[in-house]
From Swiss-Prot:
Residues covered by region (LDL and other lipoprotein receptors binding): 153-163
Residue numbers spanned by region Specificity for association with VLDL: 269-281
Gene: APOE
Single biological process term from Gene Ontology: phospholipid efflux
Naturally occurring in which organism (per UniProt): Pteropus pselaphon (Bonin flying fox)
The protein, known as: Apolipoprotein E
Subcellular location: Secreted; Secreted, Extracellular space; Secreted, Extracellular space, Extracellular matrix; Extracellular vesicle
Length: 308
């Protein structure tokens, strides 16, 4: 049994060490959101605020007990989503006509990525609001367990936030490239119509190749999206399993502590029950011995003398 507990502790410590190493790596990631597009800068401010919250310093713990943190996060979320929408509209204005099917597909993928990022940011705010309610309910008690669960959930949410932010960044790049490519195809079509008749034959072969390329790109995007979705689900499940192991360990330790306290209380209760009974039996036995000795005429303090 001790060996199993030792193996479990080693496994959990190894997981914690991996979390610390990954924490350092993720802490360096926000640099990519600096001094670029306005939406990336807004996301960078949200990220920096989240990293400050994760320190769980005394100042953070104090401010988490009121609604100031969640209100500021709400403003940062609204600012980020506003900048994303503005950037998308700017891209649409900069380019010419695009194939309706391609535009619908790219726009749908972009909206889904934007929705995932917004959901991640809202999850952070919701989790902090939940912690505030739990901490206020446990005011005056030990909140180490609440802080441990909050830190674990924030690590998980931050990894998901980074992953979906990178996905949105890629989708915007694909959207920009797709619209620019459509504009270039429009220029090529004008050259085709105004070109000499002798070039008409070769130019007519271009549209089918472009259609094939569009289909290949669409198929590639679909496959890549599915692979990313599967990978994301696998990472989320691993994170869930790790969180469940941590919660299970905490519950087992708590139950073991309760069992130990109950056993000690039961032992004390048994002692309080039987100790008076034993003392009473000792008194009764001593009294019985005295009565027997008195009846036989034997003094309890002297031995009977031998008669000659």
């Amino acid at each position: 049994m001790k060996f199993l507990w030792a193996a479990l502790v080693v496994t959990l410590l190894a997981g914690c060490r991996a979390d610390v190493e990954e924490e350092v790596k993720l802490g360096q990631e926000p640099d990519r959101w600096q001094a670029k597009q306005p939406w990336e800068q807004a996301l960078g401010r949200f990220w920096e605020y989240l990293r400050w919250v994760q320190t769980l310093s005394n100042k953070v713990k104090e401010e988490l007990l009121n609604s100031q943190v969640t209100e500021e996060l709400k403003l940062l979320i609204e600012e980020t989503m506003k900048e994303v929408k503005a950037y998308k509209e700017e891209l649409e204005k900069q380019v010419g006509p695009i194939a309706q099917e391609t535009q619908a597909r790219l726009s749908k993928e972009l909206q889904a990525a934007q929705a995932r990022l917004e959901s991640d940011m809202e999850d952070v705010r919701t989790r902090l609001a939940q912690y505030r309610s739990e901490a206020q309910a446990a005011l005056g008690q030990n909140t180490d367990d609440l802080q441990g669960r909050l830190a674990s959930h924030l690590r998980k949410l931050r990894k998901r936030l980074l992953r979906d932010a990178e996905d949105l960044q890629k989708r915007l790049a694909v959207y920009q490239a797709g619209t620019h490519e459509a504009a270039e195809r429009g220029v090529s079509a004008i050259h085709e119509r105004l070109g000499p008749l002798m070039m008409e034959g070769p130019l007519q072969a271009i549209p089918p190749s472009q259609q094939l390329r569009e289909r290949a790109e669409a198929w590639g995007q679909k496959v890549r999206g599915r692979l990313e979705s599967v990978g994301s689900q696998a990472r989320d499940r691993l994170d869930d399993m790790r969180d469940q192991m941590e919660e299970l360990k905490a519950k087992v330790e708590e139950q073991a502590s309760q069992v130990r306290l109950q056993a000690e209380a039961f032992q004390t209760r048994l002692k309080s029950w039987f100790e008076p009974l034993v003392q009473d039996m000792q008194r009764q036995w001593a009294s019985l011995v005295e009565k027997v000795q008195s009846t036989l005429g034997i003094s309890p303090s002297t031995k009977p003398s031998k008669t000659k």
